From Swiss-Prot:
Gene3D superfamilies (alphabetical): 2-enoyl-CoA Hydratase, Chain A, domain 1
Record's catalysed reaction(s): N(6)-carboxybiotinyl-L-lysyl-[protein] + acetyl-CoA = N(6)-biotinyl-L-lysyl-[protein] + malonyl-CoA
Top-level taxon in the UniProt lineage: Bacteria
Keywords: ATP-binding, Cytoplasm, Fatty acid biosynthesis, Fatty acid metabolism, Lipid biosynthesis, Lipid metabolism, Nucleotide-binding, Transferase
Domain CoA carboxyltransferase C-terminal, first and last residues per copy: 40-293
Keyword Lipid metabolism carried by entry: yes
Pfam families according to UniProt: ACCA
The EC number(s) this enzyme carries: 2.1.3.15
Subcellular location: Cytoplasm
PROSITE patterns: COA_CT_CTER (PS50989)
Designated name of the protein: Acetyl-coenzyme A carboxylase carboxyl transferase subunit alpha
Length: 315
């Protein structure tokens, strides 16, 4: 199967394969088959709109994990200028599962922090598949406190299955690192905007997700546990993951309806991986607009608004 397509996209993949075959035939024989290619392209677009207009929660969860989906560094490259990555937590080491540094958005200095997964096997291992250890969260905390000190807004990108549950992480007090970040972010006297770009997994996501404005990409997810994990607990089998995904309400639209998410950012047709540059442009537009809005509040108003936002969850 074409790695650019998931199994429920197979009809689209078949049409795209036919289009590529026709292009090759046309190149080899100098035949004018442009009309047929255009017809198939229109058919592919219509089919894509039909499939993506009716995705289940489980299908959206799989889209959030798509191996071609843009990651934090992809968005940094396409949204910001003059990015200067900063390293280390000043306690133990540098965690490559969290990237962060100073950049400019519309000429304004900002602190950008996000989870980073990895493409190839070696990079996946180096970045621990996007699952931070305590030093990753402590690095993020250090950068956020730096941002407050220099009056820079904080922009975070969330994309993790969850915090790393290994013994070494627990020995270095993973839960304390996450809890400390929640405490610090709730009190930071600078605007914070968080955007879920893929998986928003449990406390590992929330540790850089306390904010004044929460965005989710159209095909991202945000939940306290993975659908497979939930299914394993409730039904004793991960095969019930589709049912768990539906019951948990993990999608952007469901969470927007609950008042947890402020803005659902549309993705290009077929998902952000089909057109990463266009996806980045949509995020950039929203970030610029939200930063301008948050600048209208002084520090006391910002903190009061953030507190009210957090206390409204579950009401």
């Amino acid at each position: 199967m074409n790695p650019n397509f998931l199994d429920f996209e197979q009809p689209i993949a078949d049409l795209q394969a036919k289009i590529e075959e026709l292009r090759l035939v046309g190149n080899d024989n100098s035949l004018n088959i442009g009309d047929e290619i255009s017809r198939l392209q229109d058919k592919s677009k219509t089919l894509t709109e039909s499939i993506f207009g009716n995705l289940t929660s489980w299908q959206i969860a799989r889209m959030a994990r798509h191996p071609r989906r843009p990651y934090t560094l992809d968005y940094i490259e396409n949204i910001f200028t003059e990015f200067d990555e900063l390293h280390g937590d000043r306690h133990f080491s540098d965690d490559a599962a969290i990237v962060g540094g100073i950049a400019r958005l519309d000429g304004q200095p900002v602190m950008v922090i996000g989870h980073q997964k990895g493409r190839e096997v070696r990079e996946k291992v180096r970045r621990n598949f996007g699952m931070p250890r305590p030093e990753g969260y402590r690095k993020a905390c250090r950068l956020m406190e730096m941002a407050e000190r220099f009056k820079m807004p904080i922009l975070t990108f969330i994309d993790t299955p969850g915090a790393y549950p290994g013994i070494d992480a627990e020995e270095r007090n993973q839960s304390e690192a996450i809890a400390w970040n929640l405490r610090v972010m709730a009190r930071l006297k600078t605007p914070i905007i968080a955007t879920v770009i893929g998986e928003g997994g449990s406390g590992g996501a929330l540790a850089i997700g306390v904010c004044d404005q929460l965005n989710m990409l159209q095909y991202s997810t945000y939940a306290v546990i993975s659908p497979e994990g939930c299914a394993s607990i409730l039904w004793k089998t991960a095969e019930k993951a589709p049912d768990a995904a539906e019951a948990m309400g993990i999608t952007a639209d469901r969470l927007k309806g609950l008042g947890i998410v402020d803005k659902v950012i549309a993705e290009p047709l077929g998902g952000a991986h089909r057109d990463p540059v266009a996806a980045a442009a949509l995020i950039r537009e929203e970030l610029s607009s939200q930063l301008a809005m948050l600048k209208e509040f002084d520090n006391d108003e910002l903190l009061a608004r953030r507190y009210d936002r957090l206390m409204s969850y579950g009401l």
